[in-house]
């Protein structure tokens, strides 16, 4: 959000009103009189400032003596902190209302119920608000239309609509279930949590995702629902889509790195994509999860993750944050390198202070956001705020300003502008303002005048339980939610970061038992999804041959990561046997490939795939399709026949394979025959052979094979007769 969009008023430190530019002959915007003023949001209760006025003068005088700080947005320039404040005040005094010409204040006032979502506890809070909404939409997308809206703060003593915040109310063009509106809000607030986690790793530019709530107009027929967001001025850009990378002249590093970060930091559980917005203030993101069942129809699951990584070129930010490149085939890598060349034009400059993804040095500031992932950092805890050196003024409204943590103790919002970039305090949720609040992922109470002691607590933090309205429409301090409570509510989301590279994931899996290894890697499922997209022609132009080499590349990676379907498919493919996945692909028949194929089949058999067990048993039994480095072994064959016969549960991949491919009576009969004759390392056992023939006969009778059952009974008698001899 640009600075022009931040609606706030100026008050004197001692409670006096600021002289307005152009009145009483005092219009000098650069007047030193500005030193006596601080920025106060119109949502603030003026009475609350009386508790801190005694501290303001002393603190502000210290601020004017602060040392110069650097900016990642323009590292060659340095700005004195006092000058930055004066610049922000100047912007505030001359800020016009971009919607003044539409005279929304003349529209009839409507009372609405506002539904806000707390992403920490998963709870909803309802309250009443007053709005004025235009009757005709000013924008229309593929699915929704937008209406200009003003919302009155609940803490104004008079209905001053001309100073009310500008909002955009959105509704679906086609009727949808009401739950869709609530799911959209939940998605955006969950994505906001990941934006805050990304910012805590000190990227060169921080990101923020807009607050969104729901308003229900109960006085209208049908009580329609609308999404409500702050209005943002600026150039709206789509950085990546729900299905991959978007090539644009305005190439950016941060949006792509943010999506990659969410994948690794969540332990591959999800990825935030469809990044779009103004600058690094994003809206309407999409989350792909492992299951693909949450967050509406736009959640493509691991298929969506595959689409992102197929076109993602790791950039300087990815490297500085320790994000591992996703494994692509040489041909895919060549295509992605074209994007890499485009990234060279990006102007983001690294500061060298970026924290590695999942680094134990990344600490969670208590009160800065919900304690999401807090137990994952070994040294998580309150960061010592004695060091408030301002490393950068990032391009996002979510960014932390030099002394925003300290200013928050005084209930001050902080604004700065640099190279058309607005930055705000991101690390403290209790920074109340009419602009978009970044680190605010829980909703506030809307009582007035309940203030805790503004004195900073240990480590320089203030956990003030101020009960203001946050006009951000969603979320207040999460510091009131203890870590233990959050962990209890969200235990399934506490996971360690995992790299996107197969080699590192294989190292992790090798430390697990086999039953915990098969089908447990989400990264393996992503590679398997890449195989399906290649086979389906998604990654090739119409009329072109799809890339079989790349498909086999990803199938091998999926197999190495324990995807049972990939293991079986490769085993059949290398063994020159019919296979259902990549059915059109045939590999050369070489001794090396035969060895690979049998190794994969043996691995699948050990993982519980019944078809592979039978194939391995037959190979050891007859010697056909056996790898060159192995020989016939009836003892092994008997073991795998027995294992297949006992296979009645699901395999390690969670699938159930019945007895359709090989009748039970046939395998029992073959076991009996091997024990009757002996050989290839198996000793003769006539008694057990007769017992197995009897079981085979009973199984044949159950299968309505009476004649075959009689043959088995006869052979059982022959085996027992040999035993008597």
UniProtKB/Swiss-Prot annotation:
Signal sequence, renumbered to the chain: none
GO cellular component, one term: glutamatergic synapse
GO molecular function: ATP binding; calcium ion binding; calmodulin binding; elongation factor-2 kinase activity; protein kinase activity; translation factor activity, RNA binding
Biased composition (Basic and acidic residues): 1-12, 423-436, 445-469
Impact noted for substituting residue 348 to A: Decreased kinase activity
Modified residues (Phosphothreonine): 348, 353
Record entry for activity regulation: Undergoes calcium/calmodulin-dependent intramolecular autophosphorylation, and this results in it becoming partially calcium/calmodulin-independent.
Catalyzed reactions per annotation: [translation elongation factor 2] + ATP = [translation elongation factor 2]-phosphate + ADP + H(+)
Taxonomy, superkingdom: Eukaryota
Stored Gene3D superfamilies: MHCK/EF2 kinase, Phosphorylase Kinase, domain 1, Tetratricopeptide repeat domain
Disordered: annotated span: 1-38, 352-405, 423-477
Phosphoserine modified-residue sites: 18, 27, 61, 66, 70-72, 74, 78, 243, 359, 366, 392, 398, 435, 445, 470, 474, 477, 491, 500
Domain Alpha-type protein kinase stretches: 116-326
One Pfam family in the UniProt entry: Alpha_kinase
Compositional bias of kind Polar residues: 386-404
Residue(s) carrying N-acetylalanine: 2
Compositionally biased residues, Low complexity: 363-377
Post-translational modification: Autophosphorylated at multiple residues, Thr-348 being the major site. Phosphorylated by AMP-activated protein kinase AMPK at Ser-398 leading to EEF2K activation and protein synthesis inhibition. Phosphorylated by TRPM7 at Ser-78 resulting in improved protein stability, higher EE2F phosphorylated and subsequently reduced rate of protein synthesis. Phosphorylation by other kinases such as CDK1 and MAPK13 at Ser-359 or RPS6KA1 and RPS6KB1 at Ser-366 instead decrease EEF2K activity and promote protein synthesis.
Family: Belongs to the protein kinase superfamily. Alpha-type protein kinase family.
Biological role: Threonine kinase that regulates protein synthesis by controlling the rate of peptide chain elongation. Upon activation by a variety of upstream kinases including AMPK or TRPM7, phosphorylates the elongation factor EEF2 at a single site, renders it unable to bind ribosomes and thus inactive. In turn, the rate of protein synthesis is reduced.
Protein name as annotated: Eukaryotic elongation factor 2 kinase
